[in-house]
Regions:
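Bacterial N-terminal signal peptides
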Residues: 9-19
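Non-membrane alpha-helical structural segments and their capping/turn regions in soluble enzymes
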Residues: 60, 64, 96-103, 150-157, ...
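Aromatic-lined substrate-binding rim segments of carbohydrate-active enzymes
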Residues: 63-131, 201-212
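Active-site neighborhood of glycoside hydrolase catalytic domains
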Residues: 152-217
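Hydrophobic faces of well-ordered beta-strands that scaffold small-molecule active sites
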Residues: 49-51, 78-80, 116-120, 179-183, ...
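Aromatic- and acidic-residue-enriched carbohydrate-binding clefts of CAZyme catalytic domains
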Residues: 44, 81-93, 98, 102, ...
Length: 217
């Protein structure tokens, strides 16, 4: 009963965030939507069995090995946080190469028959310094993190645009492995600013995730 309640909550979040996402797809792509008490992958019931893998914590030569281990354990999906403070360690200096090549991580997942759920934050928790928020945000002494602070939102939008450049072409609608994208992370335990969450949703959409299903939890 509890599991059903959790699923209904997630489906409600999907309905509120996704709108008509997943209704159309490129000819070489697919769809992923929330159906009646189940997820639908290309129109067929699909149970998400997800493993959490943090690419900064795994040396790049071992990425594929860890993905294969997850598949061997019966998983079909990898959840992927995007750690803002490793991709933009200095303001306006973005790095998505080498150990930070999240697009390659997703391609390795697809190569091994795994789907991907992207969780770009901006806050990701993950027992990671500042939950992934860059230290340099604090140079602005009056900044309000995870609120509609103009400077914070401007920086989030810039970062998400870079994430979109890397990952939006890899959604299932474009033939890639990404089936869902999370909006913020565990925000309900932090605040109740619904307009802020809606603004983050809009930024995620604007960054290129126009068709993929969004969710919040």
């Amino acid at each position: 009963m509890q599991k059903l309640s959790i699923f209904r909550t997630l489906v409600l979040s999907l309905a509120l965030l996704a709108g008509s996402a997943g209704a159309s797809a490129a000819t070489d792509g697919g769809t992923f939507t929330a159906g009646n008490k189940t997820f639908l992958l290309n129109g067929k019931p699909f149970v998400v069995k997800a493993a959490e893998l943090h690419y900064p914590r795994i040396p790049r030569p071992y990425w594929e090995h860890r993905i294969k281990m997850c598949k061997a354990l019966g998983m079909n999906t990898v959840c992927l946080y995007v750690f803002w403070n490793i991709h933009e360690q200095r303001e306006d200096q973005f790095d998505f190469t080498g150990q930070n090549d999240i697009a390659e991580f997703c391609r390795l997942a697809q190569k091994n028959g795994m789907y991907v759920i992207v969780r770009p934050g901006p806050y990701v928790c993950a027992e990671w310094e500042m939950g992934g928020l860059p230290w340099w945000l604090l140079k602005k002494k009056d900044i309000r993190l995870r609120e509609q602070d103009p400077y914070f939102m401007k920086r989030v939008e810039k970062f998400m645009a870079k994430v979109g450049e890397q990952l939006a072409p890899l959604t299932i609608q474009h033939g890639g492995p990404i089936i869902m994208v999370q909006v913020e992370n565990e925000y309900g335990s932090y605040g109740e600013d619904k307009p802020y969450v809606a603004a983050i949703r809009d930024i995620v959409r604007k960054s290129g995730f126009t068709d993929v299903t969004l969710f919040q939890c």
